[in-house]
Amino acid sequence: MRAIISLLLISTMVFGVIEAVSVQKSLKIFEGERGDCVGESQQCADWSGPYCCKGYYCTCQYFPKCICVNDNGK
């Protein structure tokens, strides 16, 4: 009986750790912390990527040449 309870507790803890890691990865993607972001004066496309890194936004003054510019703390 103790073995069954111990096995259930261990499997619950393992599942909790796996779930926490997958949620953390999902949050990184949702927050835009992706590896495919580009910096200032780099070409971007808000609708399909590459996306601007945090602190920059994509502006399209001369389509299709959209570039990332600093958001100056907006």
UniProtKB/Swiss-Prot annotation:
Keyword Disulfide bond on entry: yes
InterPro entries the UniProt entry points to: Beta/delta-agatoxin_fam (IPR016328)
Subcellular location: Secreted
Signal peptide positions on this chain: 1-20
PTM-bearing positions, type Asparagine amide: N72
Signal as UniProt keyword: yes
Family affiliation: Belongs to the neurotoxin 07 (Beta/delta-agtx) family. 03 (aga-4) subfamily. Aga sub-subfamily.
Name of the protein in its database record: U3-agatoxin-Ao1h
Source organism of the structure: Agelena orientalis (Funnel-web spider)
Lineage, uppermost ranks: Eukaryota, Metazoa, Ecdysozoa, Arthropoda, Chelicerata
